[in-house]
């Protein structure tokens, strides 16, 4: 009796079994159904071999799409586990807004956030000293995730930039970091605009609620285009309290802020050195 491989499925039972293999391969790789089917036929139903075929094809597609223009995407807030680890805003790009709103793209954004936070913690923030090198490092770490997403979405994707939050040198003790994300798609720390703030505690070991830090980040997002002394601005949502007064009442001093809107230059404020 002649040998019958998966290439030659004819009986209904065989077809059903083949489709189960296709379903499993798609679940594992997130590749299109047509690609999964072709890879399984090419490898006579060998799941591991089919996965290798898909990886090679995905890598080839990623290389072909690597030079295509990426003008859409989101910014991602990355805050280390301690203030010493630092904080930064990562910009992740795709070719179209449609792809940027896809769950696979947003998954890459979350992976980028987690990977950069790990690097920041492992290096005590030193990875942020050279933002361009940090982009290369993160891109290398994310190479497999980017390749898979490019293969699934059919569009180029890349880590465009990393903007670090730099505290004022004379106000680097007892630091706290706050983050606020605007225009998110129900994905934590991923949105159209991110605001980061570094604040110094006046009283050591005092617990500062997270929502206080978030409120300061929200203020700088809302007023990022404003000119003049930020300390004398009305705090966002208040008609009577200035930023300086609002912070003082909560035992905090402003050190620096960073606001990044996708596609625009970052806006930075840094506390001036006191007059001697």
UniProtKB/Swiss-Prot annotation:
Gene3D superfamilies: DNA helicase RuvA subunit, C-terminal domain, Elongation factor Ts, dimerisation domain. SUPFAM superfamilies: Elongation factor Ts (EF-Ts), dimerisation domain, UBA-like. One of its GO terms (biological process) is mitochondrial translational elongation. GO terms for molecular function: translation elongation factor activity. It is found in: Mitochondrion. One of its GO terms (cellular component) is mitochondrion. CDD domains: UBA_EF-Ts. Its main location: mitochondrion. Keywords: Elongation factor, Mitochondrion, Protein biosynthesis. Associates with the EF-Tu.GDP complex and induces the exchange of GDP to GTP. It remains bound to the aminoacyl-tRNA.EF-Tu.GTP complex up to the GTP hydrolysis stage on the ribosome. Belongs to the EF-Ts family. PANTHER family: ELONGATION FACTOR TS, ELONGATION FACTOR TS, MITOCHONDRIAL. This protein may be expected to contain an N-terminal transit peptide but none has been predicted. This is Elongation factor Ts, mitochondrial. It comes from Leishmania infantum. The lineage of its organism: Eukaryota, Discoba, Euglenozoa, Kinetoplastea, Metakinetoplastina.
């Amino acid at each position: 009796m002649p040998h019958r491989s998966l290439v030659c499925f004819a009986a209904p039972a065989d077809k059903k079994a083949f489709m189960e293999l296709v379903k499993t391969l798609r679940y594992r790789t997130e590749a299109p159904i047509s690609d999964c089917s072709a890879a399984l036929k090419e490898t006579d139903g060998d799941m591991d071999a089919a996965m290798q075929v898909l990886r090679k094809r995905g890598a080839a597609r990623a290389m072909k799409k690597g030079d295509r223009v990426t003008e859409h995407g989101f910014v991602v807030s990355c805050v280390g586990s301690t203030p010493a680890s630092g904080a930064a805003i990562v910009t992740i790009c795709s070719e179209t807004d449609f792809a940027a709103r896809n769950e696979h793209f947003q998954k890459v954004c979350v992976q980028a956030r987690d990977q950069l936070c790990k690097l920041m913690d492992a290096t005590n923030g030193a990875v942020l000293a050279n933002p361009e090198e940090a982009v290369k490092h993160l891109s290398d770490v994310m190479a497999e995730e980017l390749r898979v997403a490019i293969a699934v979405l059919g569009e180029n994707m890349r880590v465009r930039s990393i903007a670090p939050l730099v505290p004022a040198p004379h106000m680097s003790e007892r630091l706290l970091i706050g983050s606020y994300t605007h225009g998110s798609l129900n994905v934590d720390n991923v949105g159209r605009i991110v605001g980061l703030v570094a604040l110094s505690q006046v009283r050591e070991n005092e617990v500062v609620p997270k929502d206080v830090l978030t409120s300061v980040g929200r203020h700088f997002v809302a007023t990022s285009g404003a000119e003049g002394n930020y300390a004398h601005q009305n705090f966002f949502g208040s008609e009577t309290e200035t930023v300086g007064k609002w912070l003082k009442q909560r035992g905090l001093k402003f050190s620096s802020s960073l606001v990044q809107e996708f596609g625009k230059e970052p806006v930075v404020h840094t506390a001036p050195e006191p007059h001697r």
